[in-house]
């Protein structure tokens, strides 16, 4: 299968689509951010927002658009700022900070 867009471009388009006053930061992480993704890799996105209820449905709709339009899967995780700051020294978030690419 020939991919029309690379996954980093898809991630940036997704981030541009979901940017709003309710989202503080959007971070691409994982294999796509590192550049070692494979055919079966998904696109890992961490969204920092204190307004989960206001963005969850819209984010889910945009994930579905990417699945249909680009035939790629986005794994979008929403985390509030307090939880992010409290757990940023844990291994998961340490890796996100080390390898992550800020998209918005």
Model regions: which residues?
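Catalytic core of pol beta-like nucleotidyltransferases
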Residues: 1-27, 33-39, 49-104
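Short beta-strand->loop micro-motif that forms the acidic, two-metal-ion catalytic signature
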Residues: 44-48
